[in-house]
Amino acid sequence: MHRLVVALVTLIGLTGAVFLAGYFLLFSASNDRAAALAPADSVFYFNVYLQPSSGQQMNLGGLIGRLPGFADEASLDEKVDQVVQNLLGASGLGLDYREQIKPWLGSQIAVAGRPADGDPTQPDAVFIVEVKDRALAEAALGELATQGGFSFTAETYQGVEIQTADTGAYAFVGEMLVVGESSVGVESVIDVDRGAAALAGREDFRTTMAGLPADHLASAFVDLGALAEATGTADQLSAFSTAGAALIAERDGIRLSGSAPFEIDDASASSAAGFGLGGEPSSLVDWMPEDTIAELVIFGLRQTLEDAEDAAASAPDGEQITSALDTVRALASFGFGIDIDADLLPLLDREVGIALSGLGGALPSGQILLRPEDPEAAEAALVRVVDRLVATGASERTEEGPGAEITVLSISQVGEIAYAVRDGVIILGLGAEDVSAALQAHADGRALGGSDRYAQTFEVAGERAGNEAFVDIGAVVDLMGATFELPDDARDILAQIGSFGFTAPSRDDRLEFHAVLTVDEP
């Protein structure tokens, strides 16, 4: 895409960044003018508002004020402008945000993607930007084109002048600037302005957006049904039709919340089973040591893997994937005598957790925790796996742990793998110390699930059930040390970020998700 279009797209992308754009992206009631111009066959739609609302402005101002260098509210506007300007400068586009963009930029920016040549997997994206001063916008676009050495040809479509080049086009449709990769996308918006069906008129779009929190910073809509049909995954995603999400500023962090209607009568048996498990909060976090810095819990992992394999089999080039999986099964069977489907998958049929607490030399320290549907059958399957590994040359010993016996396997060219079983939970680690740490955390009640940082993260999320993830951002940055080369100001800002959390609860007839990024007090 030529320099002008890249410049506008870059601006829109920068405006969508969580904290910088967060200062601007403040909800402006119900006047979504861009959705009224987006084509009805759009498969995705992202929208942000630049008009402040008092509650969101207060929360965002407080969050940004916690970051190093942003504590002075009087100069907050200037500092945010400077950061945006620096980012544009780093892009190499030669744009001056204060002089060339900010004076004409209105209160709304949106992007809609519609099928190119009827293929939803190859959407033709158009950007719809509200303009508060068209004369300034036209002058700025002309200046940007001159700076880039590009020339445009004017053509008229349904009474609207479109400026076109080999790799991009733009037009003013009323008070909106429409930018596309080609004139086709721009023409589709003009068609809507002249009476063609709009995304805003779709019942599923209105229903999805009405289900989002009213006071938000930005919103998104995805036509899952169209994408599933186009990608050959309609059977696996038959229970889903659309999805929507909203970005919200809370007092202690930024929250992205969304949902997708779930038609259980249309779902496959495995999808329905996985959905049913998502209504309960994870219990495995009560076994993870308090110093855990990152964790992931998945409910129904077995069902997810089986669904993914079925989807791969029906996808283009899926035969290569299924053939590779068959090879893995054969190697496990002939090399170790392990039947993956009978011995390993039953361990993953309910709740699976991974916890990371640090790096010990070249290997991570942490645990894999399993709470299977049938603990006794799963433990028997685990014993079979151990017996077969011992039969192929591994050595086995046992140690006493806090409340449970720990079995340690030493496998040539692999190292040590330890495990213990207690209260229906299987704990695995790369050594007895990791397993013992989990047993001790549960016995003492000093586990991650009871820590303040974990509790605060999911308090901002407002929910905790189903699949989840947690990352202590500051601890991870400290752990990585000099591994990442970051500017000092970026490292200071990351140090002020508290944690990331994600949860995906099942609620009645919908699947929700909530992702949060917290910001610590100075």
Sequence positions of predicted segments:
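Active-site lining segments that contact anionic ligands and/or coordinate catalytic metals
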Residues: G253-R255, D291-I293, E351, L363-S365, ...
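Short, surface-exposed charged micro-motifs
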Residues: A34, A112, G168-A169, G244-I248, ...
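Long, C-terminal catalytic modules of enzymes
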Residues: Q413, A432-E433, L439-P522
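Short, hydrophobic/proline-enriched secondary-structure or compact coil segments at domain edges
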Residues: P123, M176-L177, A245, E250-D265, ...
